[in-house]
Amino acid sequence: MKLWGGRFTHQVDDLVNTFNSSISFDSRMYKEDIIGSIAHVTMLGEEKIIPKEDSKKIASGLYEILDKLNQGVLKIDNSSEDIHSFIESTLTDYIGEEGKKLHTGRSRNDQVTLDTKLYLKGYIKILICEILNLEKTLLNLSSENKETIMPGYTHMQKAQPITFAHHILAYSEMFKRDISRLLDCYKRLDEMPLGSGALATTTYPINREKVSELLGFSKVTLNSLDSVSDRDYAIETLSCLSLLMMHLSRFSEEIIIWSTDEFKFIELDDSYSTGSSIMPQKKNPDVAELVRGKTGRVYGDLMTLLTVMKGLPLAYNKDMQEDKEALFDGLDTTLLSIKTFNGMIKTMKINKSLMKTSASSGFTNATDVADYLVKKGVAFRDAHEIVGNLILYCIDEGKSIDNLSLSEFKTFSNKFENDIYKAINLLTCIEERKVIGGPSISSINIQIEHLNNFIQESNEKLNFLK
């Protein structure tokens, strides 16, 4: 059944029907469409816009359809134009003429916006739950690796010694921001659009606040033109997902590097690796590589929506039907990526000894030698020059800083004493960095405590979301 057609004298071409149809992708919103319709028809009955007995009969029919769809007894007809027309035509088949009163006082324009917002509200909560599961994994990893020394890098060159916990907690901060962004996005999503009609509301005395209350929205939208032409909520969601995927991609890149034979910092579990069809020895980090690749896919979904919306006049235009495939793909891709990535890092093995050995080379304690001289009264710029010359000497002689004798140290400055050896010990280098945000154990403990509190607080916020 089509929801329109009275003014047409010819049947629409089959090719146009196929081109126009959205049932193949908007059918996933059948629950939201039915729940929204139940709230709408309940209001119609309470406001005496339709007889109350008709309202109850329609609601009962909608509940029956929902139950049968959930059980798989009723199958969605893919020849329908969209999920809205399928639900309404099925309702009329079930209960008769009263079903035709369901659409009183609304348009598909405000209906589809409502469905999408309801769907997104539920999906965002699922996404946040999965990010929190990932954060719990990072919390455990960092708690177990407070003293696991590794090299920190800038420009992919060894820079200063840090701990694996410090490195892992850097990503936890990124994911904390992702959760905060999604929660913030949820606030703007939480505005009920139904009642906006096609663009100019309706002449029926509907009660939008009642529908909003029934559906668990915090408020109603204030301008009907904006309500039906707005897709900011979808674009903002995809923006949040793009940033989240970027963080997963950066982490994945490091997982890939760390798992190479050249690094061997970690070993991925067999259950999260794949092999080669020709090279028997291969163990490939496909999960990390796919996360990295799928990030571009989510970026593409965002660009699709931005491009669709960039030149549209008010109010609704059919171009906006193109929002759902991109939105749903971005949601599904991100959710699967988070869950799979979490399993990968939860099961990977950490090679602590190789991390420490790597941190011991590459002059990662050079900055600490300069800081040592500063504490002895040497200006930092002079200390920097002295240590630069010392490093050049080490390179020429094939030595590390730790292997220099005191007399060799004194060749570069008479400020060097026996306590230099304690100052350049890697653990000392780390423990001296007690500043908030640093890699020392005391600082890491604070970061871990903050992460633990954040996880608990975020779970509490989730419980309060309608």
From Swiss-Prot:
Superkingdom per UniProt: Bacteria
A Pfam family that the UniProt record links to this protein: ASL_C2
GO terms (BP aspect): arginine biosynthetic process via ornithine; L-arginine biosynthetic process
PROSITE patterns the UniProt entry points to: FUMARATE_LYASES (PS00163)
Associated pathway: Amino-acid biosynthesis; L-arginine biosynthesis; L-arginine from L-ornithine and carbamoyl phosphate: step 3/3
Family classification: Belongs to the lyase 1 family. Argininosuccinate lyase subfamily.
Name this polypeptide is given: Argininosuccinate lyase
Species the sequence originates in: Clostridium perfringens (strain 13 / Type A)
Name of encoding gene: argH
